[in-house]
């Protein structure tokens, strides 16, 4: 097989949109409609080429010699944030993601390739919402607050039927990630992050912060009486990729053991990713300040103040964003000729990768950036997510030779601590309830569909912003077997 270069893989990858919402934290609750319809269970039974995102060893259970799956999914989050008696709804309410996978048996071996959305999260609040003007300042900014994090994979699986009812599988994954962010911060947030004696929600440092601190009168400086807001902006209008991008690799291992006819045990391990930093050379930052007119003109303080914007251009780097390791164990039992039940338990190790969200802004060394030209700022938002345990339960009933019905539940806790909950990253959905069906048009052509509903949950951050989140999602897949 020809070796695809890292650059070619990335070019292919960004031509596919990937999701930006939250299910099990940022992970999807089910990959492929067969799994999703059964509550996200997938460790111990054949669930199509989506096995490359679940337990690759189940590809070895595929009864046909070759299989092609083509799928489309939609995630429909319903997110609202409120504070002080006002509320705002997110306009990001539908995210579509295609997927494709192919697998083929070669004797005891199975190979293939798949391209799937991994997960993400995001919101989109209008500039006309209460979030669009953090200080309710004289400057009317109408700031859009938007986040869209998306992660996808191209997966190359290899499985082996070792005999004696044992099946083993592994994958090599090319992983890409993209992030759009438009985020307004109030003066109180900035002061908390910049003051070493405070830093309850995050911290900021660097030569740019030092230069601003020398002007910021609440910190003993001269020239800036107040900061109405600071605004980070690196976002594009593409449905296919984020403004800040990175890529790297991951991998999975799995096994299935057929205890007896119709009763399987399976397990998998998804390794933590090795992604490089997400970067864009086209980022912007602006600060709305009440500044001394003399200082603003490059001279001595005049004692007269005016509202003004300080726009900066530069490079933004999101440091060390990774996807977590996942451990999963499951069973599947064919209770009767037509009735199957399955159960999985999964641990998603968010604590290892979501301790902090760190951005580094390097201002361009150009005249338009004034005294901040060439300066650097590191901003860290504390996250401190907890590891998440997920229990998936599912059942399938073969109504006729052509039609199978599926039902399931996916049960978990919110991994995001209330103290650090952000309206832009409300990955707080917990339980999901699912249903689906499969229909065989012939021995070689079939369709599978699943729908998932996450009831509304509500959490309030330490800053007093309440986020509510419910979600409806579906997946549709057409398959050809031969």
Label the predicted regions:
Residues 43-46, 50-65, 102-108:
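Outer-membrane beta-barrel pore proteins
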Residues 1-21:
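Gram-negative bacterial Sec-dependent N-terminal signal peptides
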Residues 21-23, 33-40, 47-48, 54:
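Residue-level signal for pocket-adjacent positions within structured domains
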